[in-house]
Amino acid sequence: MTYSIVARDPGTGQLGVAAQSCYFALGSVLPWARAGVGAVATQSMVDPGYGPRCLDLLAGGVGAAEALERVRAADEGREVRQVGLVDASGAAASFTGSLCIDEVGHAEGDGFSAQANMMAGPGVCEAMAAAFAATPGSLATRLLAALVAAESKGGDARGQMSAALIVVEGERHEHPWEGVLTDVRVDHHPQPLAELGRLLQVAEAYHLCDVAEGALIAGDAAAALAGAEAGLALLPGEGNLLLSYIGALIGVGRMDEAKAEVQKLVGVRPPWEGVLRALIQRGLVPLPEGVTLDQLFTPPAG
């Protein structure tokens, strides 16, 4: 039915969860994560309540194993559940009910737990564990690699449909919705893992865009330009990223290039002109002294 992995990155403290299933929109019920607290995967005959209940216990100082045991003990349907969680220290815990459907199992390791049920064949959890341990890069990259490894062993006996991946910061925040670094999901797709990988790249591009906009607001136009360029390298032609790039070009005084990019943006979708005018009029994209709005929208000479 489903395979998943929860993990903590020892270098950054980041926490994450990723999963795939031949089930519609598993991202709406299976993955749970809270910055500086933990990550939970609840699956099989899923009870979404395991997510917030376990996270609340972890936030209160209860360790992973005890948190899972407390929630499991209160669940009369525990034998059809499968759950994995990891806490902010990297301690992992998992449970597979006796009524979960074969091939079924879980594998815990240093800072992670992989779990699977209704698989096409054996070795799925072990493949996830090995791929997670061997893959370099960010936590999101390693989580996705674990999912790909699971699919290489046959994956869900019914096939593929949906996937999700969440990564949160290692430091706790005041509110549980804060500190989310990555939250992407595929609800219905013939190749959900490939689509999840594409969305991770889109998410990274937009993260760079957010960094660029923050730098521009802080008055660091050079950093804004570097961030916008990096984002566009990942996602060429994306309108929102082009808007950040234009703002950064204006900030560093490269007006002819900014005008050229404005023409490209407005040429593809004319209503962007109104958006950019509104941002400038409200001071969110400041123009250099002596440059007017109309001049910005005038094509550069030559």
PLM-predicted stretches and their roles:
Residues 1-221, 229, 239:
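N-terminal nucleophile
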Residues 213-214, 247-248, 280-282:
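Residue-level recognition of tetratricopeptide repeat
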Residues 231, 264-265:
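Canonical positions in the second alpha-helix
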Residues 236, 270-271:
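Short coil turns that delineate tetratricopeptide repeat
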